[in-house]
């Protein structure tokens, strides 16, 4: 015997800004999807929304073998890619999609993940198909989930399907509106923040992907094709249909309400139907290292209906119907050119077309309690009930473009010049009408808002800007000071009157990076921004936000100015897997757009009007996590603190609203190969609100435990339990528990079939609670959820 050579693959390796995790070094055998793999990795988290977080930052790009996987969101990947296909997980910090710009731009907030597949999964179809069934008191349960993947150097094809009525949400309405498709605004760092608004009226969102009843149909396909080395073509298509039943009981405490009125208790039963569609196409042409041309197009189309039966202790029974069929088309053209070693050019342009048409209808049976509002709106009182409606349409057309030039002075410094523009046009039309008993429709004449129940307004925005930034590396520090000069031109035309606002402004910014060690960084960022609101805030005619909230805009609104300071710290020790991040953010807004609210005499129905506040609004947030591995144990503590203070006027009286939320979490997790693994967690939340003369404080205590075990190498047992105590300063308002469990069998890890029995909500909990605050009220909500479901499933592995 001459020698013994021990070959060992490091669980984690660091190369520059890239962390590479060897998945099998952390897997325990109970993993079934990418989400399970990522949860095992130190420094990587899956948040409550199902998104991947690294260094406390949400990861928006996930690739497989370097190819985009439904660009713009990581949830589809984590919930669907099978765990047995994952070889390596590469975390790419300071990620730049354009290699030519990697050395001249700061990308500290850009983190991407690339999944490397195992050799047996390349050039072959892989994935699984799951089918399941069960029974409940209400109806029969079903589940079909095909997930198919193919990867080769030339092309890739992925298909994900999901049809179920057991509440497993593949793609929610919230996911749809948060799905960026990978688009980033060229002016995102210019200092201008322009809102196009969100013109949904009041569609309810699922809480923690739970509701009283959820039916889902989902299909998505993603592809990439490289016909030659210089050309890449890709895209995806997504369709989702969901039918949801929601039930809520809410107690509302108003900040300032007319004398003699009690707080409000409401009950609502809501039916929703959502059809959501999305289509994206991308092309990238790179003939050589000095040229790169990109074109992307993303189309969104949806059709949503919400029918709500609402009962108020103050306003009686109300039937509300809301529908909307919006669409948008976004396209971008980017070209990057490297002239030589010291001169780089980049052109980015993005064009957005958006059309929204929300419709609202409310039928109020209790006429007496709505009399004051009806008189203000000019409604006809000689009817059986008040049946009012509103049609609204908002059309947006925006061009966002810029030209960048970098001059590399030496190895440690460069100068960046930016010439850009934002051109935006919005058209806003709305009218309020009343349905009479004889089936005719009339348009009322209000006695408020100058007698206008209609809007026809054109809003134009223009920003021409020139920016300069200097980047210098000095030792462990990187300094990037800069300033941009903006020429703004804003106008709105309504009722034959044109209102303009033209001004010039300098906006400075500064970024300092302190690279303490190879894997330890301190980052300071300051930015001054000009904030502009959308067209709806300028429309002076009355608008129904809902039956109890009327709105009248102001044509004379001006922009707001904000100062933002952010300090972040990150450290990773690959020897004991100590992971630390901390982030502090402070924001101060001057001349911010706030509302003055007037309650209709004798009711809690109010009319709000925006104005530029003379008082500064402030917010301060801090969050951090410390995580360390001790052998087979991984411990972590995390805190999130958010404080905000803003000013408004209610009943002609100034009101200072303060909110302070705190969430603390401690977690202990094991990582055994053969023994069962346990994840213990305790979450403690405080929601403290001071709204004018009123103050409320709510507490939530949530211990939880998760157990997963591989038994006899064939059985996988998983269970999770959480207990929630929701209280105020005087009493416990509600306690609720959730317990889920599953037991699956497969002959071995290479078996084609796996059989599983799964139970959700074993304790048959019927509701959960949460608190929330708005600018005029604080509310505590009881939210009803699905009952106990037990299903049997069969999974076939390709």
Mark where each language-model region is:
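Face-selective signature of the C-terminal outer-membrane beta-barrel domain
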Residues: 229-240, 275-305, 319-495, 577-586, ...
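Membrane-proximal, glycine/serine-rich, low-complexity loop/turn segments characteristic
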Residues: 3, 9-307, 320-359, 403-424, ...
């Amino acid at each position: 015997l001459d020698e013994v050579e021990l070959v060992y693959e490091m669980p984690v390796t660091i190369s520059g800004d890239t962390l590479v995790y060897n998945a099998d070094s952390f897997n325990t055998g109970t993993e079934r999807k990418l989400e399970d793999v990522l949860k095992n990795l130190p420094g990587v988290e899956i948040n409550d929304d199902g998104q991947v977080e690294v260094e406390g930052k949400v990861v928006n790009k996930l690739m497989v073998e370097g190819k985009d996987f439904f660009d713009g969101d990581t949830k589809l990947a984590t919930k669907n890619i099978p765990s047995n296909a994952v070889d390596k997980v590469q975390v790419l910090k300071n990620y730049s999609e354009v290699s030519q710009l990697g050395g001249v731009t700061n990308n500290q907030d850009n983190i991407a993940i690339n999944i490397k597949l195992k050799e047996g999964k390349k050039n072959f179809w892989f994935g699984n198909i799951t089918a399941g069934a069960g029974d409940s008191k209400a109806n029969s349960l079903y589940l079909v989930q095909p997930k198919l993947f193919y990867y080769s150097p030339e092309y890739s094809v992925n298909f994900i399907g999901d049809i179920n009525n057991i509440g497993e949400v593949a793609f929610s309405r919230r996911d749809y509106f948060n799905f960026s498709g990978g688009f980033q605004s060229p002016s995102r760092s210019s200092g201008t923040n322009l809102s196009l608004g969100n013109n949904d009226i009041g569609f309810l969102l699922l809480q923690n992907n739970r509701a009283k009843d959820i039916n889902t149909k989902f299909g998505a396909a993603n592809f990439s094709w490289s016909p030659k080395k210089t050309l890449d073509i890709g895209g995806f298509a997504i369709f989702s249909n969901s039918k949801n039943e929601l039930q809520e009981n809410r107690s509302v405490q108003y900040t300032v309400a007319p004398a003699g009125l009690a707080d409000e208790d409401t009950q609502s039963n809501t039916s929703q139907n959502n059809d959501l569609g999305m289509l994206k196409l991308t092309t990238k042409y790179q003939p050589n290292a000095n040229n790169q041309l990109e074109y992307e197009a993303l189309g969104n189309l949806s059709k949503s209906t919400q029918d709500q039966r609402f009962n108020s202790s103050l306003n009686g029974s109300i039937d509300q119907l809301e529908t909307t069929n919006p669409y948008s088309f976004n396209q971008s053209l980017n070209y990057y050119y490297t002239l030589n070693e010291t001169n780089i050019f980049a052109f980015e342009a993005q064009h957005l077309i958006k059309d929204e048409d929300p419709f609202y209808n409310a039928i109020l049976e209790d006429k007496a309690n709505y009399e004051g509002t009806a008189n203000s709106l000019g409604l006809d009182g000689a009817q059986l009930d008040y049946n009012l409606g509103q049609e609204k349409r908002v059309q947006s057309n925006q061009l966002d473009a810029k030209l960048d030039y970098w001059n590399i002075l030496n190895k440690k410094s460069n100068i960046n010049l930016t010439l850009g523009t934002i051109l935006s046009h919005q058209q806003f039309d709305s009218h309020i009408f009343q349905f009479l008993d004889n089936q005719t429709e009339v348009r009322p004449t209000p006695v408020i808002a100058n007698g206008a129940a209609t809007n026809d307004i054109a809003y134009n925005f223009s920003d021409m800007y020139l920016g300069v930034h200097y980047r210098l590396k000095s030792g462990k520090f990187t300094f990037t000071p800069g300033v941009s000069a903006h020429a703004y031109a804003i106008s709105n035309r309504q009722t034959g009157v044109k209102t303009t606002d033209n001004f010039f402004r300098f906006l400075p910014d500064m970024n300092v990076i302190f690279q303490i060690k190879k894997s330890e960084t301190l980052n300071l960022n300051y930015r001054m921004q000009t904030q502009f609101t959308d067209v709806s805030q300028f429309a002076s005619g009355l608008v129904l936000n809902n039956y109890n909230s009327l709105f009248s805009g102001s044509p004379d609104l001006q922009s707001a100015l904000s100062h933002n300071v952010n300090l972040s710290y990150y450290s990773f020790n690959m020897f004991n897997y100590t992971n630390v991040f901390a982030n502090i953010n402070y924001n101060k807004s001057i001349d911010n757009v706030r509302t003055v609210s007037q309650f209709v005499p004798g009711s809690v129905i109010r009319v709000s009007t925006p104005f530029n506040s003379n008082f500064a609004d402030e917010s301060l947030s801090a969050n951090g996590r410390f995580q360390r591995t001790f052998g087979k144990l991984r411990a972590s503590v995390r805190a999130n603190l958010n404080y905000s203070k803003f000013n408004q006027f209610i009943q002609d009286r100034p009101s200072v609203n303060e909110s302070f939320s705190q969430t603390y979490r401690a977690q202990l997790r094991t990582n055994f190969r053969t023994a069962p693994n346990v994840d213990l967690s305790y979450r403690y939340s405080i929601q403290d609100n001071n709204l004018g003369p009123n103050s409320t404080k709510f507490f939530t205590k949530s211990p939880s435990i998760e157990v997963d075990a591989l038994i006899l190498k064939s059985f996988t047992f998983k269970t999770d339990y959480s207990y929630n105590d929701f209280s105020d300063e005087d009493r416990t308002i509600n306690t609720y528990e959730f317990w889920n469990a599953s037991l699956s069998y497969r002959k071995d890890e290479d078996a084609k079939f796996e059989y599983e029995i799964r139970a959700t909500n074993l304790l048959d909990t019927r509701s959960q609670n949460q608190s929330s605050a708005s600018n005029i009220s604080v509310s505590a909500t009881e939210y009803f959820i699905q009952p106990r479901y037990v299903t049997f499933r069969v999974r076939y592995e390709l």
